């Protein structure tokens, strides 16, 4: 069989009986395998040489022909062809079945494919196939119906009654006849008519049936091929039988399964020849069906066939499925030769592009190269001799090895390979010993440390592979993190500590205050020991003297020439910033040089500093006692309020946790202050934390402050804090509480790592075929981006979101009118600076989400490749990079819990509103009432404020150059002051002149207010920075009276909707609305006036605490009822990772909110079946119904005006609702924001475009709403591009196009619905995917990476793209590349 390498596509179909026979080289008639005496295969058996080929090379079975010269001759005695024994891997046989048999994939898997075609239920189909019931094939002129099932008695009765005028049968024969008689075209049109009749209420079964029928029609498969008359036998080398040491044999399970089939088949044949009784024949047929089922899929059956030692046998399906199956074990994850692994140790003397390989390992890895050189140098003349020289390890061998490995890169890999930086290329350097030496700065990319980690080495062999290793994979070409473009090669730990020590400043040390005219003099003074590294000195730089320290001079002097003087204390953050800046300004070559210098300086001065920790370095603040006493007093007050019944149990708990969190924070601040002052900032513990070398504020707090609150395993916080720290030692109870958190940490780590790994796998699978394929897709759509702010605080600047993208619109300067950015121009760092200067902070950019490339994405929509800060090149596998960028931090984050040791991470809740900067209150929104001279918000509200960025008294101004409300930008003239100096603006904003002040103010911002907020200011007020303007209760949401009157209870019945509980701790009676839902009861509180007329009504949600009595008088602003917030949980990505999972899988959240479907006015209706009906009446007066579970806390009241997409009740948002109500763009923004929120909280930076790539893949399909004149089926899910294509064709022919709505599919489902059946089959549900693909006759275009890896092609990205396939690497000379 010739090798097939050059093919573009692969197709899978159902094999017809003729096709199976044409593959076969002969029929297997006996179940014997090999002869026990001769150990040669038996004739006509499962290993027969006549069928499958000879077992001995170029020799027939009987030995008549023994030589290659008889190649191709068939022996006349034994009928065995003289050929190579490798044909036993390719040649197939077959078994002629004595009775037809159904294929388990097509009848057993849900939904049963045969069942759908014939419209028979799975259980009925089973009973026919297993010879329990008859099915009527032709009713003739009887009362029977076609396809009617008859049991034994009914059949006998019908036989007696009608004789031969009808035909009924059982088993696979009956099903085969029915399938042969199917008219697919007629059936298809019949079902389409049924679908149109049913319209919206079409059931899934109809759609499934139609899809299967269409698939059969398109593929050319015949339905009756799902029933087999002939069974293929796979080649014997694939189901081998090998002799073990003790003379026993080990055999593949498949041989046992085949043996059972053959035995039963032969027995059935004999019985049929003997005309045996029907009942015996039927039983044998059933057994044959069973044995064929277990051959194809043993694990899917109820009664599994077991072999020796009671182990289920592995069938053909099992060989494909799962992690140990053919796809994942052998095709996607192969073991590689020319590789080795060993423990890693640090190699501080290496350059960034080098790694140390143990000499012995290198000799083994490069053996073939060494042998070649030995023969070339004529030291030996054959390979055998060369091998023995290598074993003796003579000197010549080492010399040759040295030459061979020069400039021959090797790849180093550390498992788990979470992102592409887990494999990098290095130039090998031979080292003594048996450990691989690794450069300390690449550890971060590998996430490696030297506590026993192992790494694998791989040798790229071909010149092309070596060239790619040098050009693309060398560690010096991988300085940036592809997830966000920040440097990933940066110093940490010892290096940081050394440089921090070197660049710190210290008072009163040798040489303080001296002046030096140049750097060399400083270095001389240090060498002569007349100057301390940390001394403050003055050095001439350029024309002037600058104040610096000797150490900083040493550092700057060592850096490459171009880099300007660095005059600050270097912490890890400062070093990363420095590396980033140097990369942007000077490029990678200077950075690489600088990194090696930084590494050497860091290690050198860390050694000189020689820091050690002693108990006296851990300083416990004297004030600790005061803080703890204050906290205890506050807690006593909270307890007192609780005892009086003023607050509920949940509020008490939340308040206690909040007090301890605040206390801990205050104590930590005090402790850090003390440590900073200790020894002029040279306290070692403080230095380690401040420099970022080791440890964190959190860990020091546990050493010298207090351990604080701990979390239970459930995530709840234990309200009893650990007041001691590790220096003082823990009491027994404190130690016991501690163990809880520590154990949680370890258990979480183990479980969550697997979760994160699985997330990565699903992400890779959905995005693996997203490759940059074209330059420009020509779209005119884009997405809006702006800086992400929380109030005035910028969380993520515009730069992070827009740099490296392309603009979709032309942007002109608002002042000069010049074009700053043109359409389709790249947004660079400089362009962003220009835009910021003129005050533009919103852009519309091209994005992967709006890219219209048919396959993958285009260069312009993707923008910049973060791994090298250049525009992305065609052929870049951006999908996989996106998946790795999202998955890799997931794994890192799961391990985060465990380092803090389970200390609870709950912030203390604020109960005040105060802004960091001065502002003017511009307006209010939301229902509020006047109470005690302030405003009380009875519902959620919004403050509209303008921040004051700059202010100056009018009295100091001589001449004003600007007017009220004018926009100003940086550098614009504002005024001339009394001394005649022109003052320029250093801000962007608008001029406001008020209260004799000239101010620059920002654009209006919104601040949301909770229910029950009390506001102390009025519209138009100027408020100075930090002033408290309002207060609220952070732990409870009140329901507040908005009118004055008398309370009247409605549907509040004790024991039904109201329960009274006596609190055992306080003895108070708590009145609480139950959360049970009653059909007709709707608990409410009415307020009535003097005449008894209802003037207000308040719906009470479940779990609300009543604060009033029936008939009581009430005033405006009084609290009617309270809803407690749930107890504080500690926030950790343990909560975050499942959240990311849910978003990517588009799961419907448990506690769902209902969103308004349209904008309009809310109208409350009665409760029906435990759900409250709320109508939203739109502008045309149309009512849109919303059903909300009774007992949910409503966020709207009768008569409120809502916008489409507003939440009507408490709960989580369902992404599918967002798509339906607000459309695709809003959904993309929602998913992006939610996913980013989880990562941002953990301090992980991932660029939006990576998440965008995944979301794009989730929104690839649309659902057909109206069929028009297309071939689509109503409710079918189809690919967007296929939909547009077919519509285009139909419109051109003058037909009516189909209409579809966008849908969102979770990543697992989307991976299984992918175009490539090979990729889908190797992901999950292998047999199901292959079953459907074979019916549809699917063609795999081999576009993605995975399918090409499976079939052994180069992946179609980078240098493997079709563009480059015709390019050949040629050597100039005969020497090795």
Curated annotation (Swiss-Prot):
The reaction(s) this protein catalyses: RNA(n) + a ribonucleoside 5'-triphosphate = RNA(n+1) + diphosphate
GO molecular function: DNA binding; DNA-directed RNA polymerase activity; magnesium ion binding; zinc ion binding
GO cellular component labels: DNA-directed RNA polymerase complex
Annotated positions binding Mg(2+): 449, 451, 453
Biological processes annotated in GO: DNA-templated transcription
One Pfam entry name: RNA_pol_Rpb1_4
Cofactor(s) essential for the protein: Mg(2+); Zn(2+)
Positions annotated to bind Zn(2+) 2: 777, 851, 858, 861
CDD domains tied to this protein: RNAP_beta'_C, RNAP_beta'_N
UniProtKB keywords: DNA-directed RNA polymerase, Magnesium, Metal-binding, Nucleotidyltransferase, Transcription, Transferase, Zinc
Source superkingdom: Bacteria
Cofactor binding annotation: Binds 1 Mg(2+) ion per subunit. Binds 2 Zn(2+) ions per subunit.
Enzyme Commission no: 2.7.7.6
Similarity comment text for this entry: Belongs to the RNA polymerase beta' chain family.
Primary role: DNA-dependent RNA polymerase catalyzes the transcription of DNA into RNA using the four ribonucleoside triphosphates as substrates.
Subunit structure, as described in the record: The RNAP catalytic core consists of 2 alpha, 1 beta, 1 beta' and 1 omega subunit. When a sigma factor is associated with the core the holoenzyme is formed, which can initiate transcription.
Name of the protein in question: DNA-directed RNA polymerase subunit beta'
Species, as recorded: Borrelia duttonii (strain Ly)
Gene name for this UniProt entry: rpoC
């Amino acid at each position: 069989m010739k090798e097939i390498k050059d093919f573009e596509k692969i197709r899978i179909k159902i094999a017809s009986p003729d096709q199976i026979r044409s593959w076969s080289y002969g029929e297997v008639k006996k179940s014997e395998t090999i002869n026990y005496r001769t150990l040669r295969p038996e004739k006509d058996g499962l290993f027969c040489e006549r069928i499958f080929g000879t077992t001995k090379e170029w020799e027939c079975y009987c030995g008549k022909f023994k030589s290659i010269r008889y190649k191709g001759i068939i022996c006349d005695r034994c009928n065995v062809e003289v050929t190579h024994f490798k044909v036993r891997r390719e040649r197939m046989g077959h078994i002629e079945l004595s009775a037809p048999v159904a294929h388990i994939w097509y009848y057993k898997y849900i939904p049963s494919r045969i069942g759908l075609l014939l419209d028979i239920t799975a259980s009925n189909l089973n009973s026919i196939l297993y010879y329990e019931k008859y099915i009527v094939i032709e009713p003739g002129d009887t009362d029977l119906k076609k396809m009617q099932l008859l049991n034994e008695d009914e059949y006998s009765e019908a036989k007696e009654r009608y004789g031969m005028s009808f035909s009924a049968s059982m088993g696979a024969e009956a099903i085969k006849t029915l399938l042969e008689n199917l008219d697919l075209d007629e059936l298809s049109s019949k079902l389409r008519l049924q679908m149109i009749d049913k319209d919206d209420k079409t059931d899934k079964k109809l759609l499934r049936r139609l899809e299967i029928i269409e698939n059969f029609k398109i593929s050319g498969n015949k339905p009756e091929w799902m029933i087999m008359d002939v069974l293929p036998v796979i080649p014997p080398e694939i189901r081998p039988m090998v002799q073990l040491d003790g003379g026993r044999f080990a055999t593949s399970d498949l041989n046992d399964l085949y043996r059972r089939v053959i035995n039963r088949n032969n027995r059935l044949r004999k019985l049929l020849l003997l005309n045996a009784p029907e009942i015996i024949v039927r039983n044998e047929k059933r057994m044959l069906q069973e044995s064929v089922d277990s051959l194809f899929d043993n694990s899917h059956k109820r009664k599994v066939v077991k072999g020796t030692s009671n182990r289920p046998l592995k069938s053909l399906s099992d060989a494909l499925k799962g992690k140990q199956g053919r796809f994942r074990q052998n095709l996607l994850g192969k073991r590689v030769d020319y590789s080795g692994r060993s423990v890693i140790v640090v190699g501080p003397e290496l350059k960034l592009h080098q790694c140390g390989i143990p000499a012995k390992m290198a000799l083994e890895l490069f053996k073939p190269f060494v042998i070649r050189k030995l023969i070339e140098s004529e030291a030996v003349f054959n390979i055998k001799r060369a091998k023995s020289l290598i074993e003796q390890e003579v000197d010549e061998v080492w010399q040759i090895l040295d030459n061979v490995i020069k400039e021959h890169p090797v790849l180093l890999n550390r498992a788990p390979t979470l992102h592409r930086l887990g494999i990098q290329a290095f130039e090998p350097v031979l080292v003594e010993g048996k450990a691989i030496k690794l450069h300390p700065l690449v550890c971060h990319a590998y996430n490696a440390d030297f506590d026993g980690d192992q790494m694998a080495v791989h040798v790229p062999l071909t010149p092309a592979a070596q060239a790619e290793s040098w050009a693309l994979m060398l560690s010096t070409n991988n300085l940036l993190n592809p997830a966000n473009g920040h440097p990933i090669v940066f110093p940490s730990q010892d290096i940081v500590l050394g440089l921090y020590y070197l660049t710190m400043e210290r008072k009163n040390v040798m040489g303080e205050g001296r002046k030096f005219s140049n750097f060399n003099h400083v270095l001389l003074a240090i060498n002569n020991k007349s100057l301390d590294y940390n001394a403050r000195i003055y050095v001439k730089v350029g024309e002037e003297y600058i104040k610096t320290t000797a150490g900083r001079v040493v550092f700057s002097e060592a850096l490459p020439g171009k880099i300007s003087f660095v005059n600050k204390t270097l912490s890890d953050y400062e070093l990363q910033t420095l590396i980033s800046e140097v990369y942007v300004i000077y490029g990678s070559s200077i950075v690489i040089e600088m990194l090696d210098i930084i590494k050497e300086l860091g290690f050198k001065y860390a050694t000189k500093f020689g820091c050690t920790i002693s108990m006296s370095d851990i300083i416990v603040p004297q004030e600790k006692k005061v803080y703890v006493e204050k906290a205890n007093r506050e807690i006593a007050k909270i307890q007192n309020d609780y005892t009086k019944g003023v607050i509920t149990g949940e509020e008490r708990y939340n308040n206690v946790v909040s007090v301890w969190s605040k206390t801990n924070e205050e104590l930590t601040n005090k402790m850090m202050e003390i440590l900073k002052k200790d020894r002029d900032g040279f306290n070692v513990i403080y230095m380690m934390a401040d420099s970022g070398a080791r440890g964190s504020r959190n860990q020091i707090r546990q050493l010298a402050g207090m351990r604080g609150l701990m979390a239970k395993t459930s995530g709840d916080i234990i309200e009893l804090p650990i007041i001691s720290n590790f220096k003082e030692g823990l009491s027994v109870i404190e130690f016991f509480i501690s163990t809880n958190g520590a154990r949680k940490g370890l258990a979480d780590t183990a479980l969550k790592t697997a979760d994160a790994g699985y997330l990565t796998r699903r992400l890779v699978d959905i995005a693996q075929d997203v490759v940059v394929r074209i330059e420009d897709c020509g779209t005119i759509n884009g997405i809006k981006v702006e800086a992400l702010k929380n109030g005035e605080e910028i969380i993520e600047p515009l730069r992070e979101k827009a740099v490296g993208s392309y603009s979709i619109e032309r942007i002109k300067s608002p002042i000069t009118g010049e074009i700053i950015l043109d359409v389709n121009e790249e947004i660079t760092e400089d362009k962003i600076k220009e835009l910021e200067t003129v005050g533009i902070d919103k852009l519309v950019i091209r994005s992967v989400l709006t890219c219209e490339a048919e396959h993958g994405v285009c260069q312009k929509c993707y923008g910049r490749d973060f791994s090298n800060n250049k525009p992305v090149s065609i052929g870049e596998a951006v999908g996989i990079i996106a998946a790795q960028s999202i998955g890799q931090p997931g794994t890192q984050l799961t391990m985060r819990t465990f380092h803090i040791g389970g200390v609870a991470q709950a912030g203390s809740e604020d109960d005040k509103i105060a802004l960091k900067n001065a502002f003017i209150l511009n307006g209010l929104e939301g229902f509020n009432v006047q109470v005690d001279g302030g405003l009380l918000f009875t519902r959620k509200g919004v403050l509209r404020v303008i921040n004051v960025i700059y202010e100056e008294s009018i009295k100091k101004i001589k001449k004003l150059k600007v007017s009220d409300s004018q926009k100003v930008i940086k550098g614009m003239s504002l005024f001339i002051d009394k001394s005649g100096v022109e003052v320029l603006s250093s801000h962007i904003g608008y001029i406001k002149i008020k209260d004799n002040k000239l101010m620059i103010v920002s654009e209006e911002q919104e601040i949301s207010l909770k229910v029950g907020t009390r506001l102390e200011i009025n519209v138009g007020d100027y408020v100075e920075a930090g002033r408290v303007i309002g207060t609220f209760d952070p732990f409870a949401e009140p329901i507040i009276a908005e009118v004055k009157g008398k309370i009247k209870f409605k549907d509040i019945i004790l024991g039904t909707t109201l329960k009274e509980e006596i609190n055992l701790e306080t003895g108070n009676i708590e009145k609480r609305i139950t959360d049970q839902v009653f059909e007709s009861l709707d608990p409410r509180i009415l307020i009535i006036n003097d005449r008894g007329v209802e003037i207000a009504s308040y719906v009470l949600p479940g779990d609300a605490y009543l604060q009033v009595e029936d008939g009581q008088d009430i005033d405006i602003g009084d609290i009617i009822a309270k809803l407690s917030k749930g107890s504080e949980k500690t926030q950790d990505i343990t909560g975050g990772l499942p959240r990311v999972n849910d978003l990517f899988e588009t799961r419907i959240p448990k506690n769902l909110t209902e969103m308004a479907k349209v904008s309009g006015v809310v109208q409350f209706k009665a409760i029906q079946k435990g759900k409250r009906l709320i109508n939203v009446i739109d502008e045309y007066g149309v009512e849109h119904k919303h059903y909300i579970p009774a007992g949910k806390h409503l966020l709207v009241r009768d008569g409120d005006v809502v916008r489409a997409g507003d939440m009507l009740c408490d709960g989580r948002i369902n992404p599918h609702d967002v798509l339906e109500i607000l459309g695709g763009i809003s959904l993309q923004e929602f998913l992006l924001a939610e996913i980013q929120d989880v990562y941002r909280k953990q301090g992980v930076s991932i660029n939006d475009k990576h998440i965008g790539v995944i979301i794009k893949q989730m929104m690839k399909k649309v659902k057909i709403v109206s069929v028009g004149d297309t071939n689509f089926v109503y409710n079918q899910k189809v690919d967007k591009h296929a939909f547009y294509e077919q519509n285009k064709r139909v419109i051109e022919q003058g037909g009516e196009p189909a209409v579809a709505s966008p849908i969102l599919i979770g990543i697992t489902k989307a991976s299984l619905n992918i175009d490539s059946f090979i990729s889908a089959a190797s992901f999950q549900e292998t047999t199901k995917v292959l079953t459907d693909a074979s019916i549809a006759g699917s063609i795999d275009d081999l576009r993605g990476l995975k399918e090409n890896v499976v079939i052994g092609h180069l992946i179609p990205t980078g240098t493997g793209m079709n563009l480059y396939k015709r390019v050949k690497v040629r050597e100039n000379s005969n020497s090795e590349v």
